[in-house]
Design a protein with these regions (language model features):
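Short glycine/serine- and small hydrophobic-enriched flexible loop segments
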Residues: 58-65, 120-130, 185-189, 249-253, ...
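Low-complexity, Ser/Thr/Pro/Gly-enriched N-terminal "stalk/linker" regions
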Residues: 18-52, 62-108, 156-161, 195, ...
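Solenoid-repeat scaffolds in large eukaryotic assemblies
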Residues: 57, 69-70, 134-141, 261-264, ...
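N-terminal signal peptide c-region/cleavage motif recognized by signal peptidases
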Residues: 14-16
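C-terminal functional modules
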Residues: 285, 289-367
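Positively charged n-region of N-terminal signal peptides that target proteins for export
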Residues: 1-4
Length: 367
């Protein structure tokens, strides 16, 4: 009985943290960035849609309890990026309008997949299936996970890792990885469905920690066949910027009372301190010299907000970052900043939380 009361109290506390079930940010995002289930990024003249944008929108629709939008996003993604069947085809990562010289057709522009987007789609399907009692979503998620497993590679002294895409990330035994493509809570959730993913979770944790020895995650990192980091000679590997910033957000979405979060929080403390010094996280960090350029935008602030909130002695830093991300207006022209801000503000407003097994928990009002 006592355990029941405690559990109920925790649930009520979580539920009560949200002032209202309506999520204005999501409604605005839909109105300015979505058409018929398609998320549009107008920063590219081809008016592109990426599997990333679709995957994030699925998660936001789930958090908002917006079943109609979820179904619309899923249908557009499946029909336009996955040849009509996500159980058989990984979604192409890039869709848009070809140039006039190429006929100005609306079509897939790059057939390669983006593994992180596939993971987010499968995760959203798993959790929508569980929370909304939709076994068809779970079946689809399992099929996507099976396709992803084909791109898992075992790296000596590192472990199992997931390639960022089917093509272009292997070279004579070395693998090029993107730390922001490895949200550990998603891999933990996959492992509950298929134990084979447990080793990918473990290898990905090692990759995240080893790729950031000074506390700053790189946009990309290459490991040789012995599991050693290849010299950071190229610009991608020598910089932590627009890709890497998500790594801190995913780390802070990990359940707080876990050894995994403790390891990540300790490793990424230098980024929190950098955000304190600059007022916001740096837009770019040179990982060879640790030189930093100017402070990043509101989306960058949002990515480090929760990590700062959980870091002892950084309450003032978290408050400044909260103010920064709150200042962002969701507009059509700012796709990437929009999605980072939506993740950060929803997390800070306790519209969702993720437990130690990677399960998504939502306040009752938003289901």
């Amino acid at each position: 009985m006592k355990k029941t009361v405690i559990a109920l109290s925790a649930l009520l506390a979580f539920t009560g943290a949200v002032a209202a079930p309506n999520w204005t940010d999501w409604d605005t995002f839909k109105s300015v960035s979505m058409e018929s289930g398609r998320v549009i990024d107008p920063s590219d003249s081809r008016l592109i849609t990426t599997s990333e944008g679709e995957s994030y929108a699925l998660f936001f629709a789930l958090v908002a309890g917006d079943k109609a939008a979820f179904e619309s996003i899923l249908a557009w993604t499946e029909n336009n990026l996955a040849e009509g069947d996500l159980t058989k085809h990984q979604p192409a990562w890039l869709w848009g309008r070809r140039t006039a010289d190429e006929g100005a057709l609306w079509t897939i522009l790059d057939t390669n997949n983006a593994a992180d987007s596939d993971m987010w789609i499968a995760y959203a399907l798993l959790e929508a299936g569980r929370l909304w009692n939709r076994p068809d979503y779970v079946t689809k998620a399992h099929a996507m996970m099976a396709l992803l497993k084909k791109d898992v590679r075992t790296v000596k002294n590192l472990g199992d890792v997931l390639l960022p895409g089917r093509v272009g990330f292997e070279n004579q035994g070395s693998v090029k990885l993107n730390p922001s493509y490895a949200p550990l809570f998603i891999l933990k959730r996959f492992a509950a469905e298929d134990p084979a993913w447990e080793s990918v979770w473990a290898g990905s944790l090692r990759m995240l920690l080893r790729s950031a020895p000074d506390g700053f995650s790189p946009d990309w990192v290459t490991f040789d066949r012995e599991g050693r980091i290849v010299d950071r000679a190229d610009e991608d590997s020598a910089v932590g910027s627009y890709n890497a910033i998500r790594t801190y957000l995913w780390a802070a979405m990990t359940a707080e009372d876990t050894p995994t979060f403790a390891s990540l929080a300790e490793r990424f403390t230098p980024m929190v301190k950098a955000a304190r010094r600059l007022g916001r996280p740096p837009e770019k960090v040179n990982l060879n010299t640790l030189a930093m350029n100017h402070a990043g935008n509101a989306g960058f602030a949002g990515c480090v907000l929760e990590l700062a909130r959980r870091t002892p002695g950084e309450t003032a830093t978290a408050d400044r970052l909260r103010t920064a991300v709150a200042s962002h207006d969701v507009t059509r022209e700012s796709y990437y900043t929009n999605v980072l801000a939506l993740f950060a503000r929803a997390l800070d407003e306790k519209r969702f939380r993720i437990d130690a097994e990677g399960r998504l928990h939502l306040p009752l009002e938003t289901r």
